[in-house]
Amino acid sequence: MIKLILGDIEPQTGTIYRADNKAVYIDQDYSLLDNKLKVYEQAQQFNGSSLQEHEIKIRLNSFLFTKDDWDKSCSALSGGERMRLLLCCLTINSKSPDIIIFDEPTNNLDIQNVEILTAAINEYQETLIVVSHDETFLEQINIERTIELRQKYSR
């Protein structure tokens, strides 16, 4: 379903009409991050609004990346750190996406990182599409509409 929404595949029947908007897909591997870059370099890559260096570092700090973390390779980050960095990068980018699609965002996150993710999502004012089995998390981010998919089992 995500690939249909993003336009990566077309439906076998019917038509999907997509508005001209910017969507960001945050998969379980955080593939928007470049593992060859260091934390600060990654944040700088998202700097479309030409924030000054100190402003980027303030944002990194607000997502719990201290000065000691700025030279750490993105490939060495834990799942929670990768999620925090990606959320930080989205706040650095001047062109906030119209839609953010999360695929199982709480997988491999500890309680502190789930709280940071929840706070960031609750501040976001645009459209969210969240694929998740974590009902507690979905309640905390005040999902307005749900689509529940169940697999049919045949015997």
Each language-model region and where it sits:
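ABC ATP-binding cassette signature C-motif
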Residues: 1-155
